Amino acid sequence: AHLDLAWHQYIPNDVGHDEYLQWAEKIGTQPMYTINLGTGTLLDAIHIAEYTNHSGGTYWSDLRRQYGREQPYGVKTWYLGNEMDGPWQIASWEKDPKGYGVLANETSKAMKWVDGSIETAVCGSSSPFMGHFPQWDLEVLQECYNAVDYVSLHHYHTAAPGNYFQLLGGAAYIEDYIETEAALCDFVQAKMRSPRKLMLSFDEYGAMMRPLQGIEHPGWGPYNLYHSHYRFDPNAAYVRHDPDNMVDNRRREVGDMVPALGSASILLAFLRHADRVKIGCMTSGLGALCATDREHVWRTASYYPFHQLMEYGRGQSLQVAVEGDTFDLPAYAVNDTSQYPAKEGLPYVDAAAAYDEKAGALTLFAINRDPAGDTQIQLDVSAFEGYRFVEHLELCAPDMDARNTWEAPDTIAPAVGQSAKEEQGVVTATLKPLSWNVLRFEK
């Protein structure tokens, strides 16, 4: 066991390296492994890569075999630390982006010498609201651009309780973050005369509603971060990490539809930027897609947009031109650090599309962000000759406090919409207030 300084708890190491990787194999998922570049060293990274991915004949690979794992695990994607710019990190690189970039460069290079098939991700700023963004990222990338494959991004969009425009308009801020980071990468690519184009890994994201603190200390200074993470409380007690208590501590102040639409709006932003966002990880994972009362497990509303995007969001991402009524978002502040600028002209309909030519499938995904009324749409697909309209799937809640339970698991579930009509390559449909919609076409 050891102290987890960040979360002020004891970590008993009940699940170790081998246990985790073997579990990942059993459930059929690919692990994304983060190495320690705070208190850890380059040599530690070499050793863990050798233990994990080298076939045998060396100290570390033979130690793995001695522990009962003959074949290497073949972990493909490795992260060079986590949120290394954050003052909440142990041995943060906040004040030395060049130093972190040099270490990331040398570590990635060495790990790829151990196994040339792996890919690595370097940390960007852990939020677009960090005071040093994007300069910190630029200084990091200038030191490691040719050694890494991804830049890791994190952001949790926050809106005031009950403000659905703030919640669902959050996709615009996510896209600003993506486009800024991609532009930084492309600038460094040009500066380095490099043939390599870096991709983005948005490996922590979420959307939530919580009370806004507002701005207590005007300006973009680091006060709020230091106030939060430089607290030294002599009375704070360490507790044992206990997953069995996590269910009781889960926050579910709102119904199922709010987090479902919030996460879906971010996923649409990812789909629109599929040329650069190659990895996306919902932080809450199973905790968002399902719920439990300890005795039972059931699907939340968030499961359905995620599942439908995974099923139908295949092939090529298409840019969707949306013309119609819009709304404006006034600027607002969550706290001193997270200050959202004003946005103008955001369409009520948030949309993205996928075209799988090989499978003969065309799919439009759309959110009606208007909480007050239906939105009528006309979808022109006449350029896709030979494609026929298949169905309109819609997801909406009887009220925003509704949620699925074990006793009523289908309170919020997809239904086939009855309003859609096709005529000469144009589909008309009605999108209900605060609804998720999938319109499918096949050839």
Where in the sequence are the language-model features?
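Conserved, mostly hydrophobic/aromatic
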Residues: 24, 48, 78, 151, ...
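Carbohydrate-binding surface patches
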Residues: 344-386, 392-395, 434-440
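Aromatic/acidic polysaccharide-binding cleft in carbohydrate-active enzymes
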Residues: 163, 200-350, 359
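Acidic, Ser/Thr/Pro-rich beta/coil linker or hinge segments at domain junctions
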Residues: 385-427, 431
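N-terminal catalytic cores of secreted or lumenal carbohydrate-active enzymes
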Residues: 1-158, 162, 179, 186
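Flexible loop/turn segments at secondary-structure boundaries
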Residues: 39-43, 81, 85-89, 127-132, ...
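Short secondary-structure boundary/capping segments
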Residues: 48-52, 94-97, 135-141, 167-169, ...
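Extended catalytic-interface subdomain
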Residues: 146, 150-158, 167, 171-188, ...
